């Protein structure tokens, strides 16, 4: 999952508030300029693998972060001559970020710097000032976004609640400030003048023109041409949406009830594993089990409990959220509908889809419907076996139509009957899941990714030991991304092991975007700067990858993280985003890396999933953690086939979620604001669309993407269709082809968001007609059965 590559409104993702005081004095820190050579650990070639797999090795080389337990205290006590001691730093090597107070100071300093840039933008009307206008807008965007992105990450992953609170405060403040800028008539009209004046525009680069147009569109989406009171309403609504949205996303993991009560006599009589039952708490009287709705127990029962009544109770409870969460979603949907009305749009979807590859809600809905029509019969065919087993057990016979199948199989049936089916076929697979796990340690997969990237892109991943305080947990690995041509091109902080309090979803967080450092920039930077082979200074892209992989004890003192194949796929997916961030180097940050159209941003990550499912790639990665023996193809194949189990049902489920997203942000919402029932809309849509129908739970309140990917959730399916075309054209024959890697890199990755996505696809596929991005192009992309 990509974090906020949705740009939101002007200047990138999200917006902030502001407390500016010219009298504030703050320390300045020297630039950290890194030339071609990196500072990674220079030992044997297995360092990267060992750093993830050998805990004793990692704790030894990173012992400074394991032993540093003293509180950092106030930043002012630690500053010595405006610098920290050389072996200490703050988060992401930003020397402000050693404490929550330091984060607030960094935010305040950034606002002060931003205000100076705004003052210059408003006052400098010289020819040179107008020529540099877009560059300065981009610098303003970068200054604000480096706080916004940082705060977004800290809110999701930092273990210190005081840091999280400080991040929330800074985020909200910055959000307000950015929305003020988004509705600044002076800034907008000057930008419009720069773009429309032929003499000025002729001196701008293609990148500057593209960024200028994007920012002008953002101004216009903020109601810039409307009356001042309307613009004020826009700011208020946007800020309310941000606050409620953050509350919504922070509560998607919570269930309505912590347990389901089932009679002991009823559950004990069903032949369920006694060891599993022994782990379930009973009530005081000892007559009822209190089945938890979290952890592995409810899912184990969904696989093993023959009673449909009990399975349904468990499944619904696991997927139910609180009434308060439904109210948050309802308020979020209402506010977005009001915002779209304010801006003269028929729906929030219409507002959101401006500037996307699929240009309007009609195109999106047609794409989803076409995909559903194609997928539904195949999903029914996949469920046929489950339906027959269910009806056979009920002694009702079989020979079912598509309609009968879809009415028979409910969501709480899937795991139970799938387990029966797999148990009956398990004898065909000589290698159990546990055996395959032993070949795919996290370290093996990370080293395998590095080897793959070196083959197709000419870049590799190298370990670097972080300074004290540079990471938020000693378990975080710092990885330098090294190009064979240019040396260090970016940094990835890998927070991959499970830890209490962190986000439960795998995610790619942008911390700092790449951009060229202009010669006229003289102020010191708090981020790392590199120099490329042409002598150009550029801001290193910095990202954080977050996963929740668990470790397995292999002895009394040692543990290893083994990855299931779906987890390998997850890591490849997030690394796809990472490569986009690293290789999408542009002169301006507004269009670097993942700063591209929302319905294009998932392409690099989804394409990487194809590599993760290719046995040729997996054979180069899988090595037994003890014997170092390479995994055999015959061991992999059954598991790769298993990954395809009910794949069309999964695709249809994604399509249903995309349709729910369009429904909750569609035209009908505005006419139901006084009596909006999001749960009824969800359940009615489920009944209408069919396939594993859920008309019992209020799961829509747990659909977190309704905040981050509002009206654009279809992007996952859309980009999956594009990825299938690119895989077939470039990598299916040889996944290690450098020629294909270069073509893909040069056609897609290197552009970030600086090129029309349809032109990128047309170039990658050698189909110039796709550059139009018209109905025929969308139809071509949708004509695939390899999702």
Curated annotation (Swiss-Prot):
It is an enzyme of class 3 (hydrolase). It comes from the Eukaryota. Its cofactor is Zn(2+). Pfam families: Peptidase_M3. The keyword Zinc applies. It catalyses: Release of an N-terminal octapeptide as second stage of processing of some proteins imported into the mitochondrion. Zn(2+) binds at residues 573, 577, 580. One of its GO terms (biological process) is protein stabilization. GO terms for molecular function: metal ion binding; metalloendopeptidase activity. Residues 1-36 form a transit peptide. It is found in: Mitochondrion matrix. Belongs to the peptidase M3 family. This is Mitochondrial intermediate peptidase. It comes from Vanderwaltozyma polyspora (strain ATCC 22028 / DSM 70294 / BCRC 21397 / CBS 2163 / NBRC 10782 / NRRL Y-8283 / UCD 57-17) (Kluyveromyces polysporus). The gene is OCT1.
């Amino acid at each position: 999952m990509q974090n906020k590559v949705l740009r939101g409104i002007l200047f990138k993702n999200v917006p902030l508030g502001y407390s500016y005081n010219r009298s504030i004095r703050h320390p300045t820190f020297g630039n950290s300029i890194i030339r071609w050579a990196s500072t990674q650990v220079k030992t044997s070639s297995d360092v990267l693998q060992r750093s993830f797999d050998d805990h004793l090795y990692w704790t030894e080389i990173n012992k400074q972060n394991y032993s540093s337990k003293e509180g950092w205290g106030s930043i002012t006590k630690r500053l010595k001559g405006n610098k920290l001691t050389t072996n200490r730093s703050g988060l992401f090597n930003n020397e402000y970020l050693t404490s929550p107070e330091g984060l607030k100071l960094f935010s305040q300093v950034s606002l002060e710097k931003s205000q100076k840039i705004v003052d210059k933008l408003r006052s400098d009307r010289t020819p040179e000032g107008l020529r540099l206008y877009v560059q300065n807008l981009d610098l303003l965007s970068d200054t604000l976004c480096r706080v916004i992105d940082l705060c977004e990450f800290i809110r999701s992953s930092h273990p210190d609640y005081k840091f999280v609170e400080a991040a929330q405060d800074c985020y909200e403040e910055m959000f307000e400030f950015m929305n003020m800028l988004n509705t600044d008539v002076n800034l907008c009209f000057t930008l419009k003048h720069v773009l429309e004046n032929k003499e000025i525009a002729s001196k701008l680069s293609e990148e500057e023109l593209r960024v200028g147009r994007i920012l002008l569109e953002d101004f216009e989406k903020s109601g810039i041409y409307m009356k001042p009171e309307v613009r004020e309403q826009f700011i208020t609504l946007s800020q309310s949406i941000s606050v409620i949205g953050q509350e919504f996303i922070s509560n998607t993991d919570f269930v309505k009830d912590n347990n389901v009560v089932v009679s002991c006599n009823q559950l004990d009589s069903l032949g369920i594993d006694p060891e599993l039952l022994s782990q379930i708490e009973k009530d005081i009287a000892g007559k009822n089990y209190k089945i938890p709705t979290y952890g592995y127990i409810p899912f184990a029962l969904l696989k093993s409990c023959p009673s449909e009544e009990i399975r349904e109770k468990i499944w619904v409870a696991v997927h139910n959220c609180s009434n308060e969460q439904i109210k948050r979603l309802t308020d979020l949907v209402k506010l977005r509908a009001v915002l779209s009305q304010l801006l003269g749009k028929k729906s929030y979807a219409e507002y959101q889809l401006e500037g996307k590859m699929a240009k309007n809600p009609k195109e999106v809905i047609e794409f989803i419907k076409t995909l559903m029509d194609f997928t539904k019969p195949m999903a029914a065919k996949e469920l046929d076996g489950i339906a027959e087993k269910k009806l056979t057990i009920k002694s009702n016979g079989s020979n079912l139509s598509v309609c009968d199948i879809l009415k028979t199989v409910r969501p709480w049936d899937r795991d139970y009957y799938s387990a029966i089916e797999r148990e009956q076929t398990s004898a065909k697979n000589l290698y159990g899941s546990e055996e395959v796990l032993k070949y795919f340690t996290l370290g093996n997969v990370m080293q395998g990714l590095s080897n793959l990237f070196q083959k197709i892109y000419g870049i590799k991943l190298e370990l670097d030991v972080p300074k004290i305080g540079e990471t938020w947990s000693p378990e975080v690995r710092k990885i330098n991304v090294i190009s064979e041509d240019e040396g260090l091109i970016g940094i990835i902080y890998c927070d991959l092991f499970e830890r209490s309090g962190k986000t439960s979803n795998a995610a790619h967080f942008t911390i700092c975007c790449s951009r060229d450092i202009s010669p006229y920039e003289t102020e010191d930077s708090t981020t790392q700067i590199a120099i490329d082979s042409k002598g150009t200074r550029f801001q290193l892209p910095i990202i954080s990858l977050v996963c929740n992989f668990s470790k397995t004890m292999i002895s009394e003192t040692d543990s290893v993280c083994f990855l299931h194949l779906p987890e390998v796929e997850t890591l490849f997916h997030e690394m796809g985003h990472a490569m986009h961030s690293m290789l999408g180097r542009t002169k301006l940050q507004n269009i670097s890396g993942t700063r591209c159209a929302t319905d294009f941003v998932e392409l690099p990550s989804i394409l990487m999933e194809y590599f993760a499912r290719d046995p040729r790639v997996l054979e180069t990665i899988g090595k037994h953690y003890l014997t170092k023996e390479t995994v055999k193809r015959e061991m992999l194949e059954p598991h790769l086939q298993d990954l395809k189990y009910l794949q069309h049902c999964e695709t249809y489920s994604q399509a249903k979620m995309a349709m729910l997203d369009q429904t909750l942000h569609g035209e009908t919402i505005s006419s139901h604001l006084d009596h909006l029932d999001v749960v009824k809309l969800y359940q009615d849509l489920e009944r209408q669309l069919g396939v594993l129908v859920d008309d019992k739970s209020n799961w829509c309140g747990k659909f977190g993407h309704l905040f981050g990917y509002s009206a654009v959730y279809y992007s996952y399916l859309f980009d999956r269709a594009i990825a299938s075309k690119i895989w077939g054209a470039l990598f299916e024959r040889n996944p290690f082809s450098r020629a294909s890697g270069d073509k893909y890199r040069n056609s897609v990755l290197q552009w970030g968001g600086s090129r029309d996505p349809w032109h990128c696809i047309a170039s990658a596929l050698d189909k110039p007609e796709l550059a139009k991005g018209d109905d025929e192009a969308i139809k071509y992309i949708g004509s695939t059965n390899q999702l």
